[in-house]
Curated annotation (Swiss-Prot):
GO molecular function, one term: (3R)-hydroxyacyl-[acyl-carrier-protein] dehydratase activity
Coiled-coil annotated spans: none
One Pfam family in the UniProt entry: FAS1_DH_region
Entry similarity comment: Belongs to the UPF0336 family.
Name of the protein this chain belongs to: UPF0336 protein Rv0637
GO annotations of cellular component type: plasma membrane
SUPFAM superfamilies: Thioesterase/thiol ester dehydrase-isomerase
Domain of life, source organism: Bacteria
The organism's taxonomic lineage, starting at the top: Bacteria, Bacillati, Actinomycetota, Actinomycetes, Mycobacteriales
Gene Ontology BP annotations: fatty acid biosynthetic process; fatty acid elongation; long-chain fatty acid biosynthetic process
Length: 166
């Protein structure tokens, strides 16, 4: 099935910036079980040459989620977001993310293919700091399938996840 909107080559700029919070860094580190002292202590971060807490490597997924939600709120691709799953992701880090950083995000639709009745979309996601320096780039592969209902999914409020029901 083809996507309703031709998104190939589209560039989506998130309309706002994201400020990395000191306590967000700590909370995220605890949540993903990262125990390096530079995530919790300014002194430990300073020992590594940084002037603020360092965020765990996957911290930028918080901003990435905002960008994807904003994209799907504004671009009608012709399917519900519950029918879209992330099948791959690769990160390329250029600079550490520090507490207090002001980050900007852009999502480029790198490729769109149709295989076996599913749409495969690869995005290149760029995260820059307030000086315009590239902090991180990620390549994300999403798969969406419009429905014959063969993959029955629903939102489970208790677990906070999308689950397969059949």
């Amino acid at each position: 099935m083809a996507l309703k909107t031709d998104i190939r080559g589209m560039i989506w700029r998130y309309p706002d910036y994201f400020i990395v919070g000191r306590e967000q860094c700590r909370e995220f580190a605890r949540a993903v079980k990262c125990d390096h002292p530079a995530f919790f202590s300014e002194e430990a971060a300073a020992d590594l040459g940084y002037d603020a807490l360092v965020a765990p490597l996957t911290f930028v997924t918080i901003l990435a989620k905002y960008v994807q939600l904003d994209f799907f709120r504004h671009v009608d691709v012709g399917m519900e977001t519950m029918q879209i799953v992330q099948v791959d992701q690769r990160f390329v880090f250029h600079k550490p993310v520090l507490a207090g950083d002001k980050l900007w995000a852009r999502m480029d639709i790198h490729s769109v293919d149709e295989r076996f009745g599913a749409d495969i979309v690869v995005t290149r996601n760029l995260c820059t700091n307030d000086d315009g320096e590239l902090v991180m780039e990620a390549y994300t592969t999403l798969m969406g399938q419009q429905g014959d209902g063969s993959a029955r999914l629903k939102w489970d409020k208790e677990s906070g996840q999308v689950i397969r029901t059949a």
